[in-house]
Amino acid sequence: MISVENLSASIGDKQILNNISFTVEPGECLLITGPNGSGKSTLLHTIMGRPDITASGSIKIRSGELIDLPCHERSQAGVFMAHQSPPAIDGINTMTLFKEIQKVQNVAGSTSELIKLTKSLFTWIGLPEGWEKRPFNNGASGGERKKNELTQAVYLQNKTQVLLLDEPDSGLEQSSRQKIIDLIQETKNRNGCVLLVTHDKELQELYSANKLDLGNA
């Protein structure tokens, strides 16, 4: 579960979130809605621990309080975020990136097993053959980087307590929506929590039963 109490957040002198509170139980998906500028993406980034955001209040998951932890420790505690615009990383290829994730997150498996698994994930999400050797830099499109990040989410499912999805379908083809739905359902089946921000009407309707409207928060 994740419990957020009296969470406020600002970037520089601009306060974006003010005393937000909610709880998401294991196996639930929370749809976060609100007008542009209401802080939907900022809420996810605050939970993830983006360093330029100043936050106060409480963010608790099963492993404890997160509010004072840096981003990498929140990741190790079981929080994963799929970004609306995943950053490019110079000087590293995709396979090296996954090896680093395996090391940091202490995921079991040999290098050959990791290569086999990641290749199958890349095929599943629709990335081109040989993707594991591609540089993870500006040569990769935004859609390709987003697909790559979604495969990371699948790879880390067993360790993820809280999955943060910021416009996961943005910039992707229509066929990717079902894969996002599958990812959300599998996370819920494993008693993880999902926080979803999306402008996709079908996804909004599908997950509208449990909703936080920041326009009325």
Residue ranges and their predicted role:
Residues E167-P168:
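Walker B catalytic motif
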Residues G143-L164:
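GG-anchored amphipathic helix commonly corresponding to the ABC/SMC/Rad50 NBD signature/C-loop
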Residues S58-R74, N137:
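ABC ATPase NBD Q-loop/coupling interface
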Residues I2, L17-N19:
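Conserved structural motif at the start of ABC-family nucleotide-binding domains
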Residues V197-H199:
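H-loop/switch region of ABC-family ATPase nucleotide-binding domains
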Residues S85, G91-Q105:
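Q-loop/switch helix immediately C-terminal to the Walker
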